[in-house]
Amino acid sequence: MAFRTALRRVAAVNAAPATRLAGAGAGAATAARRSYATASQLTHPDPTEDSPSGKMVREHVPYMVTTYSRPPPVFVKGKGSYLWDLEDRKYLDFTSGIAVNSLGHCDEEFSKIIAEQAQELVHASNLYYNPWTGALSKLLVESTKASGGMHDASSVFVCNSGSEANEAGIKFARKVGKVLDPSGSKVEIVCFQNAFHGRTMGSLSATPNPKYQAPFAPMVPGFKVGTYNDIAAIPSLVTEKTCSVIVEPIQGEGGVMPATEEFLVALGKRCREVGALLHYDEIQCGLARTGTFWAHSSLPKEAHPDILTTAKAIGNGFPIAATIVNEHVASKIKVGDHGTTFGGNPLACRLAHYIVGRLADKQLQEGVKAKSEVFLRGFEKLRNKFPSLVKEVRGKGLILGLQLSEDPTPVIKAARERGLLVITAGTNTLRFVPSLLVTEGEIEEGLKILEESFEAVMVKA
């Protein structure tokens, strides 16, 4: 029953748009007579209720809180840029776990480290030192400075997830504000429209989207919302009452929207003027995804942050995150101000130490830039072939967005049923965040499937 309901939901979503995908034009009637690819013609038709995947979903769904609406495939294996489902069908993955698996699925050394460290020490708590928390912190600080980013990076708080990293940043900012102004008035935190910083109450309060906030209102007080890339509004937005400004150099969930250099420089300058902290959330766009170690690594020092948060790629699928701060922040944080039970455990930190070392490699970063060009050339061809459907290409490196004129859900389904996994972002945007080790051949393969998916959906329309 649950699987049938899930299938009905998917079908309803894909059948819902009454609007036609623009571009069918005068040939729409003729094109419509050509049958849309049937299940027998598709290479990866969604599993049926009676398939192994369908049976597993039907068994498990009643016991799972419905926080996600998932398509039918059940993935059981991954390697490099590919996933395999329960029916042993191979999918090219351009999502990498939502910008998580930057080294691809089941990297050999990554898997080896898990096995080795699990036999030595997994957890002993933060009441004691271990060899890897400090080693990871040192590597993060040194790699950050060497990259040209956050020139005064000083120390690191290690935790488990992006939301936790941002919560730490929010707490640290409030503490600094109270130290600087004991009256308690310097507590406001500025965030921006279309931002996404997490789902716990502090990070959610910095995520001004009614879809996420409304069911859990009221939010944590003291958050102000500004318009992304609006330089003129900064002086009135960031004031003496501001303790922190939290911003993504590239908004991921918000539609793959890059901040301009001028905007980030102006934010940094204003923060210094009023004694506020600048907090960059690079959870999705950081760690080599843009072709530099951090998305802000190419910015001048006046645009560097006081707080820098990272997660996702730092664990390549294993739960770990970090909040990097400068000495101005670190000097205000005392024993007992914050903590974490599992954060900084030796297994997670040893894995992250390996991953950060790989992602800090200049050759890998140059490879990201080269692969980005392959995507961009392919996207330009798609834009020329489907001008009324593909409106804009955004992003940098291997965090890219294709702005469509219509709901991309049918395209995502058509691509999945042809063996390609892509996801959405913002409004009508296809998001591409593949493994940073994706090959040019795999990119070309994915672009071909994407083109076929556009054609199939337009025929159906």
Swiss-Prot record:
Catalytic activity: N(2)-acetyl-L-ornithine + 2-oxoglutarate = N-acetyl-L-glutamate 5-semialdehyde + L-glutamate
Cellular component terms per the entry's GO annotation: mitochondrial matrix
HAMAP family: ArgD_aminotrans_3
Top EC group: transferase
Region of interest: Disordered: 36-56
UniProt lineage: Eukaryota, Fungi, Dikarya, Ascomycota, Pezizomycotina
InterPro entries per UniProt: AcOrn/SuccOrn_fam (IPR004636), Aminotrans_3 (IPR005814), Aminotrans_3_PPA_site (IPR049704), Class-III_PLP-dep_AT (IPR050103), PyrdxlP-dep_Trfase (IPR015424), PyrdxlP-dep_Trfase_major (IPR015421), PyrdxlP-dep_Trfase_small (IPR015422)
Family note: Belongs to the class-III pyridoxal-phosphate-dependent aminotransferase family.
Stated name of the protein: Acetylornithine aminotransferase, mitochondrial
Cofactor: pyridoxal 5'-phosphate
Organism expressing this protein natively: Neurospora crassa (strain ATCC 24698 / 74-OR23-1A / CBS 708.71 / DSM 1257 / FGSC 987)
SUPFAM superfamilies listed in its UniProt record: PLP-dependent transferases (SSF53383)
Localization: Mitochondrion matrix
Gene3D superfamilies xrefs: Aspartate Aminotransferase, domain 1, Type I PLP-dependent aspartate aminotransferase-like (Major domain)
